[in-house]
């Protein structure tokens, strides 16, 4: 059985992951970080920074879906990734990854012929506005357009 520690377990994604894990006999959620096989982080940037240090100390791989990470936290992730397996994605949706691939292709074929803007709408309880996905797409457009 794979032991998962969910950092941010009371949030929307953390609750969803917890429900999925509880419905699967191959995984178990643990409250004890040191007994975890993997840490899944959907928390807040300040909490992500702390959990990275704990994972380094105990050599625990990570999946990070927290958004709004600043340069300092991203640098910590980069350093930790040299020691630990880390998956970092602001959005885990297959559709978003397909959208990003399509945007890259479109921009390459239509450089200097279009102007882009991003508008997003969320539920009232959305904590990170603009979303990590919107920021990622904005950066992708800027990077591909140069």
Predicted regions and their residues:
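Proline-centered loop/turn at the N-terminus of a beta-strand
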Residues: 61, 85-87, 117
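N-terminal Rossmann-like NAD(P) cofactor-binding module of classical short-chain dehydrogenase/reductase
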Residues: 39-40
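Conserved anion/nucleotide-ligand pocket segment
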Residues: 98-102, 106-146
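Extreme N-terminal starter segment of soluble prokaryotic enzymes
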Residues: 1-5
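Rossmann-fold NAD(P)-binding glycine/threonine-rich loop
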Residues: 46-53, 66-88, 94-106
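Short acidic low-complexity segments
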Residues: 25-36
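Anion (oxyanion) recognition and catalysis
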Residues: 56
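N-terminal Rossmann NAD(P)H-binding glycine-rich loop of SDR-like oxidoreductase domains
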Residues: 6-19
């Amino acid at each position: 059985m794979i032991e998962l520690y969910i950092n941010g377990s009371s949030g929307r994604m953390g609750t969803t992951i917890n429900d999925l894990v509880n419905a699967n006999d191959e995984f178990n959620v643990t409250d004890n970080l040191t007994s975890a096989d993997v840490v899944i982080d959907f928390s807040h940037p300040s909490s992500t920074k702390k959990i990275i240090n704990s994972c380094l100390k105990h050599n625990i791989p990570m999946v990070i879906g927290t958004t709004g990470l600043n340069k300092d936290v991203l640098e910590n992730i980069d350093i930790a990734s040299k020691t630990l397996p880390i998956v970092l994605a602001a959005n885990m949706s297959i559709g978003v990854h397909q959208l990003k691939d399509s945007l890259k292709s479109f921009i390459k074929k239509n450089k200097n012929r279009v102007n882009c803007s991003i508008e997003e709408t969320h539920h009232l309880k959305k904590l990170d506005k603009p979303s990590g996905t919107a920021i990622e797409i904005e950066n992708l457009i800027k990077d591909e357009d140069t």
